[in-house]
Amino acid sequence: VHWTETERATIETVYQKLHLDEVGREALTRLFIVYPWTTRYFKSFGDLSSSKAIASNPKVTEHGLKVMNKLTEAIHNLDHIKDLFHKLSEKHFHELHVDPQNFKLLSKCLIIVLATKLGKQLTPDVQATWEKLLSVVVAALSREYH
């Protein structure tokens, strides 16, 4: 994947504005509420039976931060995303048996959360750049499945 200097700068500028724990929690909360079947992979999280339970669940917050920390690694290693996610792809495929479609759903939720955080700053160009970033991450996470 080729990244222009403008794309790199756009990713970094947006990233600097994010509170990772908040964005991660909100994206995962949105995933679980909008696509409730995705919760089946998170039985160890306890109560995910309602919007309120999901939004206040500390394990959702914890895992959301874990997701965002991995995304941080990707942002700081844009030219090596495929390698960066190799082991995680193996784990999600061989051990966790996660449907790779869920990665796409989470990326959609992340874009929506970015929109709520950035408002008018999420211009079409900014969105396109972040959609590109997340599609590269999703492809890397889904790699073991092919």
Swiss-Prot record:
Heme b binds at residues 63, 92. Red blood cells. The keyword Metal-binding applies. InterPro entries: Globin, Globin-like_sf, Globin/Proto, Hemoglobin_b, Hemoglobin_oxygen_transport. Involved in oxygen transport from the lung to the various peripheral tissues. GO terms for biological process: hydrogen peroxide catabolic process. One of its GO terms (cellular component) is hemoglobin complex. The keyword Cytoplasm does not apply. The gene is HBB. CDD domains: Hb-beta-like (cd08925). Transmembrane segments: none annotated. Residues 2-146 form the Globin domain. This is Hemoglobin subunit beta. SUPFAM superfamilies: Globin-like. PROSITE patterns: GLOBIN (PS01033). Keywords: Heme, Iron, Metal-binding, Oxygen transport, Transport. Belongs to the globin family. Heterotetramer of two alpha chains and two beta chains (an easy dimerization is also reported). Pfam families: Globin.
